[in-house]
Every structure is written in structure tokens, then in C-alpha cells.
From Swiss-Prot:
Seems to act as an inhibitor of cellular proliferation. The keyword Nucleus applies. This is Protein B-Myc. Residues 26-94, 146-168 are annotated as: Disordered. It is found in: Nucleus. Its main location: nucleus. It holds the Pfam family Myc_N. It comes from Rattus norvegicus. InterPro entries: Myc_transcription_factors (IPR050433), Tscrpt_reg_Myc (IPR002418), Tscrpt_reg_Myc_N (IPR012682). Signal peptide: none annotated.
Length: 168
């Protein structure tokens, strides 16, 4: 719809004021390409919200859950032949005493290494849901099959209760 400016009332100043934002006069010093004012730079207090928290310690019930035993680490550095070069555990750098005690579980009969492999495998490799379901249901299905073969009455349909008539 076209804009109609009414000149019938004779007051041209009021009419000019209604359309004045659409025109720019030569005497006005406005920068058409002026950018909007920039917000102030964020202070460092804002960035503290995004600060990474330290990793929590493992629970006391699982002291060696996240670190392999010493023997597993030593076995991974067992002597190997690489084009005539070989290295052994003697070539490993020595850590300070406390660092070794905190970093490794040195119990030779401890099964945490196997648990660590399973835990890391579950966390990082990821299994399909169907593989997990099958592995969980296999023991239950085996028990059901054994129970069905042991009891001969398992194939018989259970008896239905007689109809109950209430005398009221």
C-alpha cells in the first residue's frame, strides 16, 4: 500500500517530520557505515566458570582400578628384537618411590589388571546393545534349559483353578 502524505492541512513541517527518518540532510554528519558499539571484553572472572576441575580420586573400594599392576607394565616392556636392537625392563626410567607406589598396584595375585582391561574395553571400544543382551541372557537361558530337562512336569500345562462362585 503506497504511503500518502497529506498536504491538505497546510502544515508542511508536521508532514516532513513524519517522513524525515527516510531522508538524510546534507548538514547532518552521520556515518552510514558506522558499526554498532562493541560490548566490553569479558573479564577473567567469566572464564573461571569454564575452568576444568581436577579429576576425582578413585573410590577407596577400588584402589587399583585405574592403574595396571607392575608386572603388566613390565611385561609390556619385555625384551623384544627390533632389527637387532633389544630392550628390557632395566632400560626403563626409574620413577621416584612415592610415584611408583601411587601409580601402580604391585600385588602379583591381584586381578585388577584383567578388570582394567574389561573396564577400558567397555568404556572406549563400546559394544553393540545386542551383544550385551546376548551375553547377559545366555546364563539365564542355560538355567531355563537345565530346569526344563530336569523336571518332567515342566512340559505339562499348569492346572487352571476352578471357577469360584461367591455366596453373598
Amino acid at each position: 500500500m503506497p504511503l500518502h502524505v497529506s498536504l491538505a492541512n497546510g502544515n508542511r513541517d508536521l508532514d516532513y517530520d513524519s517522513v524525515q527518518p527516510y531522508f538524510m540532510c546534507d548538514d547532518e554528519e552521520e556515518d552510514v557505515h558506522q558499526q554498532p558499539p562493541q560490548p566490553p571484553a569479558p573479564s577473567e572472572d567469566i572464564w573461571k566458570k569454564f575452568e576444568l576441575l581436577p579429576t576425582p580420586r578413585p573410590s577407596p573400594g577400588h584402589p587399583g582400578l585405574y592403574s595396571p599392576p607392575c608386572e603388566a607394565v613390565a611385561a609390556s616392556f619385555s625384551p623384544r628384537d627390533h632389527d637387532g636392537d633389544s630392550f628390557s625392563t632395566a632400560d626403563l626410567p626409574e620413577l621416584p618411590g612415592d610415584a611408583v607406589k601411587q601409580s601402580f598396584v604391585c600385588d602379583p595375585d591381584d586381578e585388577t589388571f584383567v578388570k582394567n582391561i574389561i573396564l577400558q574395553d567397555c568404556m572406549w571400544n563400546g559394544f553393540s546393545a545386542s551383544a550385551k543382551l546376548v551375553s547377559k541372557l545366555d546364563p539365564y537361558q542355560a538355567v531355563r534349559k537345565e530346569g526344563a530337562s530336569v523336571s518332567p512336569a515342566a512340559d505339562v500345562e499348569p492346572a487352571t483353578p476352578p471357577d469360584c462362585t461367591c455366596n453373598t
